[in-house]
Amino acid sequence: MTKRVLVLVIAAIAVSVLIPPTRAQQAPRRQPGAVYDFDFPGKASGPAPRRSLSGVWEFAKGGAEGIQADGAKAMPSDGKPEHELPFTPEGRVAFMAHKPTYGITQVPSALTNDPLPGCDPQGFPRIVLHNARTEQIIQLPNQVVILYQFNKKWRVIWTDGRELTKDPEQPGWKTKDGPPLEPRWWGYSVGTWADDYTFVAESFGFDDRTWLDNAGRPHSDALRVVETYHLVDADHLEKTITIDDPKFYTKPWVALDKLPYRLQSASFDIPEQECVPSETAKYNSLFANPAAGVDDTGK
């Protein structure tokens, strides 16, 4: 690469740090080896299996469907009145303290206090509300395990009948035995079948240092998340996520609304996608900090 081309590339990247981001996180239209609904125009699917979530699931309409740069897909931070979240006064204060790089309160990346660029755990539900990619669901007799492409993370949803507490001061399971449990980045999750084709999971006991999405939406230790997985047919399921946090929001709100996934081949190999602290530090030093007029100490 010539020096002139290199300078132009660096300048373009630096400018992109300051302008409102459009789709910097765009995923490719398809994952290598994946299939999508547009690959089978007009082809009908068979009946849905009963009580079976197992398989590799990719977004039915294309690989970029899970990229939610401006916030949760069903409620983006775009300034539209219908997408204004029902903050409590405490919740709004928490929201305004966050400095995201996307949404209506965005700042240059060098000035963000988003914990994710430093590779802190994104936790749940942010794993599916900001940069969702391919998922593999493994259904066991007493658990549903979900493997996520991003950072190679996983969650366990227990289906053995245990119950969640309702007290943020005592997160975890309702039990008199064992040591006291602590808040978790991924919460504590239980699930059950509402009918033969609908699985409902509930999660509680979250570490409140995580954000809900890229737009800096906050949550408290009282957050409760409800996931609904509906088997539509042999090839599709729909995912809905509802946020219920009475400390920060006056009423529950839907973050994902029947987002469609398509079943992939059992031989589908999920690509690797990692957050690398050294790469983030290098990017900040070379581009983000100079573009925002700060040095490597952030001042």
Show which residues each predicted segment covers.
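PEST-like low-complexity, intrinsically disordered acidic/proline/serine-rich tracts
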Residues: 2, 20-299
